[in-house]
């Protein structure tokens, strides 16, 4: 099952290594990691999306992570009201003969077109994972030439 774990960490060298080492030792599949400084330059907000078999695994992982030096707080926000966003850049094969059709297909997603040339277009979308997967499904038949995803970032609402 997919779980979203957020962590507030001291912004120090090596903390991400120690954090991911715990996940590695428990053989947890990491689907995405995003990290960045917060409103305080001393702190890093990190979002991990992981795949686990059982919910009790997540509880054990969180307990282990909270024991690490330089970890302030770790929480599983999957079942809580939360905001989650991801960015994707997709370069799609778009020769002039089908470009209008492609633009019609992607319009409902409110994508941003960030580059256009004679044979392809590059689009950007911000949304949750489901919205991004839906866009990928729509443009795949036209030919995805390149794609880069940021991974999910999120935090609790309220």
Curated annotation (Swiss-Prot):
Q: Which domain of life is it from?
A: Bacteria
Q: Which Pfam families match?
A: ACT_AHAS_ss, ALS_ss_C
The processes (GO biological process) annotated in the record are: isoleucine biosynthetic process; L-valine biosynthetic process
Query: What keywords would UniProt list here?
Result: Amino-acid biosynthesis, Branched-chain amino acid biosynthesis, Transferase
- Start and end residues of each ACT domain: 4-79
Q: Which GO terms describe its cellular component?
A: cytosol
According to UniProt, the reaction catalysed is: 2 pyruvate + H(+) = (2S)-2-acetolactate + CO2
MF terms in GO: acetolactate synthase activity; acetolactate synthase regulator activity
Give a yes or no for keyword DNA-binding in this entry. Answer: no
**Enzyme class, spelled out:** transferase
What EC number is given for this enzyme? 2.2.1.6
- List the pathway annotation: Amino-acid biosynthesis; L-isoleucine biosynthesis; L-isoleucine from 2-oxobutanoate: step 1/4; Amino-acid biosynthesis; L-valine biosynthesis; L-valine from pyruvate: step 1/4
Q: Which family does it belong to?
A: Belongs to the acetolactate synthase small subunit family.
Please describe the quaternary structure of this protein: Dimer of large and small chains.
Protein name stated in the entry: Acetolactate synthase small subunit
The organism is Lactococcus lactis subsp. lactis (strain IL1403)
- Recall the taxonomic lineage recorded for the source organism: Bacteria, Bacillati, Bacillota, Bacilli, Lactobacillales
């Amino acid at each position: 099952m997919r779980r979203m774990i957020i962590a507030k960490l001291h912004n120090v060298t090596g903390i991400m290594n120690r954090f991911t080492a715990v996940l590695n030792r428990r053989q947890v599949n990491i689907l995405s990691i995003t990290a960045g400084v917060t409103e305080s330059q001393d702190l890093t907000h990190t979002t991990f999306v992981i795949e686990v078999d059982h919910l009790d695994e997540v509880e054990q992982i969180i307990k282990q992570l909270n024991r690490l030096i330089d970890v302030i707080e770790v929480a599983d926000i999957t079942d809580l009201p939360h905001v989650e966003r991801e960015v994707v850049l997709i370069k799609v094969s778009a020769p002039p003969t089908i470009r209008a059709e492609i633009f019609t297909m992607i319009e409902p997603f409110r994508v941003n077109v960030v580059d256009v040339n004679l044979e392809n277009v590059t689009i950007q979308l911000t949304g949750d994972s489901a919205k991004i997967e839906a866009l990928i499904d729509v443009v795949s038949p036209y030919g995805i030439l390149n794609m880069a995803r940021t991974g999910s970032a999120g935090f609790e609402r309220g």
